[in-house]
Amino acid sequence: MVRRVVATGTFDILHPGHVLYLCEARKHGDELWVIVARESTIKHKRKPLIPEEQRLFMVQSLKCVDHAVLGSETDMFEPIRQIQPEVIAIGFNQHWNENELKKQLAERGIKAEIVRIQTSDHSPYASSRTIRQKIKESDP
């Protein structure tokens, strides 16, 4: 049986921190599925600069990613229901509360182990926010 891992994110301004998160997530199974957030569903931070189809293309191009899909515009759990992962990998700085996520998954009959990826690249360029700020600062 193939052990599927799901990772999620916006992946706006793809950077080394994203790549590290996805490669570490891949180590928890045989197949890495990535759900790329849709612009219409992002509520907790600013809207992406890069259109969703281009973000999806960039994530699909990474060697450690086996499959990448856009998230649902109506139910964030729908792609997870379709993929049926054994593991859901959460990034070290993602806003999820693991216990709340487990509860929401259980309410939907989804059984998956939740793993928080602790590894991060401490480079100043491992944050989309920092990259945006550096671009603003360099603009004459």
Swiss-Prot record:
Its EC number is 2.7.7.2. It catalyses: FMN + ATP + H(+) = FAD + diphosphate. It comes from Methanocella arvoryzae (strain DSM 22066 / NBRC 105507 / MRE50). GO terms for molecular function: ATP binding; FMN adenylyltransferase activity. Transmembrane segments: none annotated. Pfam families: CTP_transf_like. This is FAD synthase. GO terms for biological process: FAD biosynthetic process; FMN metabolic process.
